[in-house]
Amino acid sequence: SGINEKSKIINNLNNIDNIQFKFIQKTNENIEKGRCILAFPSKLKCSYEDKNEKELIVNKNMMAITQKRYGKTLFYPLSKSTFINILGKNELIKIINESSTIIDNYVNIIFIDKNNIKTLIKFDKKKFLLAGWTSFDQYNNKITFEIEITSVNQMINNNVFTLPRKG
């Protein structure tokens, strides 16, 4: 089941270099909104619409989360993030091929990683584009990330993915 949908999603992914999208992130009762640019492989910049002016940048194997209001940045290895499976196009295609599918309002790819952590990766049924994901963090908090793609394959200045300096 879902073989036809999977092949359409993969065909789409193969033709995408970058996407820009609006997002709503829900962690338990906490709701955050903002905009992101995702460039394959493994580059992501998200600007949150919050009072702390939170910004998240992923570049290759590092993730930096900055609260511009306080001038504070925390650095994390990307391997600790649920983003890791979505940022690499080849990894994402492999997951789509190997995972089971549930089709409801979305094409849902059910991915279970080596630590037995389940992530539901959602694609819309009309355009077969990424629509979001649901995962659980190490504290078993449910994190839902809903996205609305605003552009595909636009020219992007790679400087936007420059990590802040440490220290």
Positions of the model-derived regions?
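A short, Trp-centered hydrophobic/proline-enriched beta-strand micro-motif
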Residues: 11-31
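An acidic-aromatic
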Residues: 36-85, 143
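Low-complexity, acidic/polar, glycine-enriched regions of mature
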Residues: 9, 17-20, 69, 79
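Short hydrophobic/aromatic-rich beta-strand segments that constitute the beta-sheet cores
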Residues: 21-23, 44-48, 63-66, 109, ...
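Extreme N-terminal tail/first-helix region
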Residues: 1-15
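Flexible, surface-exposed loop/linker segments and immediately adjacent secondary-structure boundaries
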Residues: 69-107
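Solvent-exposed strand-loop boundary residues in beta-sheet-rich modules
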Residues: 27-29, 69-71, 139
